[in-house]
Amino acid sequence: MSKPVLVGLHLGFAIIGIDFFLWLLGEFIAEPVKRFRLRIVAFIGLAGFLLSWIIGGYYYIKFYGPLVKPIIKAGAAPWAHAVAMETKEHVFLFIIPMALTALFISFLSKEQFSNSKLKLPTILFIGSMVAVALAIGAMGYIISAAARWS
């Protein structure tokens, strides 16, 4: 697969993950009677993040490391790799465990969820996960822009 296709798939699946976890956030705020939809939404969000993770990793090994990174480091914005990519390389590790946690929470019964007083912590947790994913996306944009500036 070509670089643009991989980058597009990486971004597209990340957007699916973000969108579905925003949907999940709304579901937890609304406290649905039917819990099945929570599980489906959380699973699709997790799948989006997993596919983005795998495709991004393949792109990193196949293209970024050998081709793009040297261009960025020699270009007009070498800090893009030193700051944005180095941060992204570590922060992205949190996304899958966070998504799995949200999925596991979605499997609690309505009674378990209510009795555990998890509504506010879950809303804050999912909101934080979405914020982390959006920050990773912003870092990806910075890195991509730095490659184009060079």
Model-derived features with residue positions:
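Polytopic transmembrane helical bundles with strong interfacial aromatic enrichment
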Residues: 1-150
